[in-house]
Amino acid sequence: QAGNFVSPDDATFKAAAAGADWSKTFYQVLTDEPGKDAWPITGATFVLLQKTQDKPAQGAAVMKFFDWAFTNGDKAAAELDYVSLPDALKAQIRKQWAEVKDASGKTVAFK
């Protein structure tokens, strides 16, 4: 989009993810993101978590796993040729987890 020649690598994929506006929704099509270093064809993998959990212990386990992955998984992701999420996005996702409730409306805690 900026007219620069970029190579498909971790840095240009991260630049595409960093250029997305994640503030309104986590659903993003990362094609042709702005930024002089952004690779133009980048994709994201999504995990859906129900806001109302009928099995809160399982929902808590899912959040605990992703919390661990966000904290400890960047190196393993890179070794498998995946690109980790930007730190600001990880923080935004963690904040959103406060909206996950059980059937009675109580927040599902995972720590």
Features from the language model and the residues they span:
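Flexible, solvent-exposed loop/hinge segments that line or gate ligand/substrate-binding clefts
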Residues: Q1-N72, Y82-K111
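A short acidic/glycine-rich loop-to-helix N-cap element
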Residues: A77-A78
